[in-house]
Every structure is written in structure tokens, then in C-alpha cells.
């Protein structure tokens, strides 16, 4: 059984406070958060394909932030997600990280649609394990994501947080 690290606990607390301060937890829902996760997963896969190390590390942290917020919205604790994940050895070359991430996303989506917390926890847990298995890139990615968002301002638009730099005139 995998335990939540002090590093994860500290950054989870920071991210959840940041998300609460911006009304992302209550002003949105886990479906919209899953869409953000899908966007970040696409950026992760693009970084892998293009062998862009900086973007790869950035995408790891961004995915983690969306998962932490999604778990909070879904009522799934971080440790419950870690405990619920099926054992998938992502170091095995026959199971590529992107394939496992897509499976995890499908579990999360199915869990949302069925309002099934066990399935949600399993999907979040599998996804977390993939990111954690990336070792050093995981800690750098999470820290970099936090440093990017910690002072970010924006507003909720149709249940989605839009950063200030992306807001169009009149929004």
C-alpha cells in the first residue's frame, strides 16, 4: 500500500486553498475538472511525442493539480485514491503511461456518470500512481505547477476558472 508523502500533503493543502480562494471547488464540478485533466493529459502526450522535457515536467504538475481538485470535488481523499488503485506496473514497457492514463480517465468519467466513489477513487489512484512513478519529474512538475498558479488571478466563467490573461474584453 502506497502512502501519501509529506511533499504531496503540503502541496495538496496549498492547491486546495488556492482552488477554494478562487471558488473552483464549489463554483465548478468534477465533470468540468475532468475536462481540464483531459486537456493536460493531451499536453503530456504531446510532450512525450515531441520529446520536450520542459513541457513534460510542466504537464505532470498540471495534471496533478487538476486531479487534486477533482478528487476534492468528488469527495475522494488522496489516500483513499492511492489505496484504491489497482496494481499496475507502469515500469513495464508493454503498458505505456499514456495508455494507463487513458484507462484512469475512463474510470474517473465512469465514476462521475455512475456516482460511484469506489470507481472514482480507483481512477484517481491509478492516475496518481502513474505520475508518482515518474519520480524526479513528479516532484519538479508539482512544484513548478504550484509556482505557476500560486499568484494566478482570474474568474469563473460558466463553471470554469479562466486565468486573467485568457479573459477576453467584457468577460
Regions found by a protein language model. Give the residues of each.
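Flexible "arm" and connector segments at domain edges
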Residues: 1-171
Amino acid at each position: 500500500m502506497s502512502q501519501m508523502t509529506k511533499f504531496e500533503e503540503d502541496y495538496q493543502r496549498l492547491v486546495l486553498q488556492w482552488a477554494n480562494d478562487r471558488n473552483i471547488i464549489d463554483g465548478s464540478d468534477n465533470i468540468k475538472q475532468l475536462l481540464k485533466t483531459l486537456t493536460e493529459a493531451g499536453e503530456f502526450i504531446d510532450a512525450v511525442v515531441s520529446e520536450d522535457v520542459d513541457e513534460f515536467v510542466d504537464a505532470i504538475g498540471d495534471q496533478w493539480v487538476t486531479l487534486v481538485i477533482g478528487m476534492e470535488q468528488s469527495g475522494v481523499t488522496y489516500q483513499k485514491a492511492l489505496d484504491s488503485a489497482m496494481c499496475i506496473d507502469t515500469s513495464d514497457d508493454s503498458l505505456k503511461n499514456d495508455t494507463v492514463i487513458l484507462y484512469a480517465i475512463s474510470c474517473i468519467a465512469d465514476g462521475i456518470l455512475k456516482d460511484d466513489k469506489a470507481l472514482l477513487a480507483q481512477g484517481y489512484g491509478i492516475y496518481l500512481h502513474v505520475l508518482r512513478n515518474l519520480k524526479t519529474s513528479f516532484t519538479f512538475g508539482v512544484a513548478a505547477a504550484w509556482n505557476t498558479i500560486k499568484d494566478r488571478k482570474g474568474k469563473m466563467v460558466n463553471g470554469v476558472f479562466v486565468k486573467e490573461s485568457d479573459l477576453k474584453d467584457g468577460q
